[in-house]
């Protein structure tokens, strides 16, 4: 798995996995399910569940076979910037 850091004994693995997916989608400007599953060395079914959750929460959008970051991140960025 790519880029884990910190004390993993005190973290939630599913949250780390979702953020690794988001980082990879950002870095590649869109990725397919297969590409993401291969990159994180996860089963496609596991990767799909993460992506479906992120899609339902409007953090990613799917266009055809590709997943992209959604505009919801702009709201988070605006909030962080105005702090």
Predicted features and spans:
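N-terminal helix-turn-helix
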Residues: 2-81
């Amino acid at each position: 798995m790519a880029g884990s850091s910190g004390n993993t004994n005190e973290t939630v693995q599913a949250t780390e996995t979702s953020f690794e997916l988001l980082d990879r989608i950002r870095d590649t400007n869109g990725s397919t399910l297969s590409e993401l599953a291969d990159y994180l060395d996860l089963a496609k079914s596991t990767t799909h569940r993460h992506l479906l959750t992120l899609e339902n929460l409007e953090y990613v959008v799917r266009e055809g076979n590709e997943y992209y970051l959604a505009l919801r991140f702009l709201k988070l960025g605006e909030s962080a910037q105005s702090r």
